[in-house]
């Protein structure tokens, strides 16, 4: 089985807050599954009624809810069919549209689309220059996506309420395009507050000299920061951030290096040209496959506001 490397921003690391409220407890009451108190939701927290006079709160490291008309809705990143050309994540304020068919070339039919608030971005790989390979051989006629809605298949912690486990299992999904170029695959992973792309290079002789992305934005500009991130700015505020591009190998200790790139303006918006071969040439004995990764995440204030006016004061905090 080929080892795959994917960039996953959502870390399932939970803070379990026990004994939030203490009420009369009936010791003879039969044990029941804890149920969620929806009125106590926050962006990153669920609160469960244990049906014995106590509550348990679970605080995730990434959002598990989004605010919709003053109501905290549960995020569901299951990829579902949206149209003849696209899949989309089922329920999130960060709306992602994944093409059913991915093809390389200057005339992009179906780019990846990201919508958040009033912001919209579309992106696609337009060019991969391979060593000693004619350009026409690098463009694929179209590769169909393999969809994986079970990125998190098991969460082995008996202390976690089933409702929380179900929410975590819906927090990530992935589309894989096999052989967009010979010996090169593409993974696009959807998370609760980000989208990551990983270009999987399976053979060293197929390492591209350059990879070019086209990025289009509506009523916004893109700037490169001193730390090699890209900021997508609208109304003088950064609304989306693209992390530095990195390439990593499959060695036990994992060699990771930043990939140099150029940002230029184009008729469609912007072009980002990466130089992976230059980077890998500086690696010491890289182990295949390689993964060239990037991640788009929206810039958001961390929110802990509850729908309910109830104040929660946990007396026991367990870190798992």
UniProtKB/Swiss-Prot annotation:
GO biological process, one term: xylan catabolic process
Compartment(s) of residence: Secreted
CC per GO annotation: extracellular region
UniProt-listed Enzyme Commission number(s): 3.2.1.4
Keyword tags: Carbohydrate metabolism, Cellulose degradation, Glycosidase, Hydrolase, Polysaccharide degradation, Secreted, Signal, Xylan degradation
Active-site residue numbers: 150
Superkingdom as given in the UniProt entry: Bacteria
Catalytic activity: Endohydrolysis of (1->4)-beta-D-glucosidic linkages in cellulose, lichenin and cereal beta-D-glucans
Broad class of enzyme this protein falls into: hydrolase
Residues making up the signal peptide according to the UniProt record: 1-29
Disulfide bonds: none
GO MF annotation, one: cellulase activity
Function: Hydrolyzes both carboxymethylcellulose and xylan. Probably has a role in hydrolyzing oligosaccharides derived from cellulose, which are transported across the cell wall.
Annotated protein name in UniProt: Endoglucanase E
């Amino acid at each position: 089985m080929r080892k795959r490397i994917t960039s996953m921003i959502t870390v399932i690391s939970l803070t379990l807050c026990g004994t939030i409220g203490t009420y009369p407890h009936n010791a003879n009451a039969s044990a029941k599954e804890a149920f969620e108190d929806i009125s106590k939701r926050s962006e990153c927290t669920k609160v469960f009624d244990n049906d014995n006079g106590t509550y348990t709160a679970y605080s995730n490291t990434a959002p598990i809810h989004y605010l919709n008309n003053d109501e905290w809705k549960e995020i569901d990143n299951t990829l579902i069919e949206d149209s003849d050309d696209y899949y989309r994540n089922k329920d999130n304020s960060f709306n992602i549209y994944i093409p059913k068919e991915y093809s390389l070339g200057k005339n992009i039919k179906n780019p990846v689309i990201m919508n958040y608030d009033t912001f919209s971005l579309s992106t696609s790989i337009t060019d991969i220059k391979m060593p000693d390979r004619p350009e026409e051989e690098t463009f694929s006629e179209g590769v169909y996506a393999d969809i994986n809605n079970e990125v998190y298949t098991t969460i082995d912690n008996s202390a976690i309420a089933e409702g929380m486990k179900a929410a975590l299992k819906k927090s990530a999904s992935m589309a894989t395009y096999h052989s967009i170029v010979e010996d090169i695959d593409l993974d696009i992973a959807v998370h609760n507050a980000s989208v990551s792309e990983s270009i999987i290079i399976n053979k060293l002789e197929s390492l591209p000299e350059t990879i070019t992305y086209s990025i289009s934005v509506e009523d916004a500009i893109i700037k490169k920061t001193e730390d090699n991130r890209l900021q997508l700015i609208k109304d003088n505020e950064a609304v989306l951030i693209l992390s530095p591009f990195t390439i990593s190998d499959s060695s036990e200790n994992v060699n990771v290096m930043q990939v140099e790139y150029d940002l230029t303006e184009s008729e469609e918006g912007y072009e980002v040209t990466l130089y992976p071969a230059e980077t890998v040439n500086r690696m010491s004995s890289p182990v295949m496959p390689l993964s060239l990764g990037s991640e788009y995440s929206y810039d958001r204030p961390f929110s802990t506001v509850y729908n309910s006016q109830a104040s929660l004061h946990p007396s026991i905090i367990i870190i798992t």
